[in-house]
């Protein structure tokens, strides 16, 4: 089956992409661009010659190839990003009928499909945060921003968490009320947000268009009057769709973030839960979201459309920052007023940094596993590990589920503190035998990171995130080159073990 990657790879040459095929099936490739093709492409733009039969046949053949390529590409986008993402890519990216599917168009259509599908590796996770925004196009179309905290990790659906923060004025604003502080209201779900972001006039046209098409389909086109034929041409644009209650709404841009702690892919419940080291603090975000809603009820908080702190975008950003977004990307406030576009850009930056760190963490895990392929390294590391015998997993599981008693948690924190000290001493012992001339810059950077990033029970989530990011990135760079000796491989395994201690302390910190 042809996938999106095949189109992206073929488009890199700069030529238009075509879909051919043989007995084995369709094949994507870059179009041939020899002297004949170059000549006909030039003649097709010459007024006196473009109507010649040979030139017209060539131009029509190219248009047919381009249409077929576009159809197959949209199908590939649909399979990867869903029908909504593919429709959006077609609506906004394929603007001219028969236009070539070149590198720029492929890149733009993939970007649009990703945008409507949602951005972020956390989308399939059971514990996630979703930042949603609708584009701001001025005071007449201000857009909107909201945030949802989801936790579907528990097998019991009754214990699932769905906390939605959507900040709205309690009344329709007049043209002179953009600076007024008025009573706010909060909406409880994304579906209501979608309905609120589509105008009544657009909704009416969509209903009329749908009704006209149904009537024409049932009665036949020749029996339709002029008004029905006109209404039938009004199709929903990308993002406009009916919900399960047959109400029209406008879908948002979505950015997905993982929650720190144990998580799993909802699509594959058989796989064991894995600890997500880099993410947002779910408990802190829930506390702030509920504080915001209580403030709306009590009147302590107000809504002001043009504001840095009291409009929809600023409230969504407030809850996002409460979860530790600034641990990854510094936040810079808007000069005059927050808006959904600025908020969306910040959310994307945070998501990109979190996903990059988690991908680097997974890469470090795989590379360190390969270090144990050496029998001597594996034996030496097993001897060190068995001498300590401590493990972060019981603490992390119990802390994450809230089942460990305070006494047990403290005992395990003490145990992990001792293990941190033991790993640090082992790393120092391995490094002591290396003279200055044998230590390169990478060795010095890793040794410095091990000193500065050793976790402790006093560290909060921010400190642990900072230490983890420094150690993961430093060790990742160190692993780019193969270890020159067993002691070098063991130093890397010790640094990897220190990351495991950070995970254990992180589990305790988010449960506190």
UniProtKB/Swiss-Prot annotation:
Localization (cell): Secreted
Q: List the SUPFAM superfamilies.
A: Non-globular alpha+beta subunits of globular proteins (SSF56568)
Q: What is this protein called?
A: Effector protein BopA
Q: Which Pfam families match?
A: SicP-binding
Function summary: Plays a role in mediating bacterial evasion from the host autophagic pathway.
Q: Which InterPro entries does the UniProt entry name for this protein? A: Globular_prot_asu/bsu, SptP_N, SptP_N_sf
Organism for this UniProt entry = Burkholderia pseudomallei (strain 1106a)
The cellular component terms of Gene Ontology attached to this UniProt record, alphabetical and capped at eight, are: extracellular space
Task: Print the keywords alphabetically.
Answer: Coiled coil, Secreted, Virulence
Question: What does the sequence similarity comment in the record state about its family?
Answer: Belongs to the BopA/IcsB family.
Residue ranges that the Swiss-Prot or TrEMBL entry lists as coiled coil: 347-377
Q: Where is it predominantly found?
A: secreted
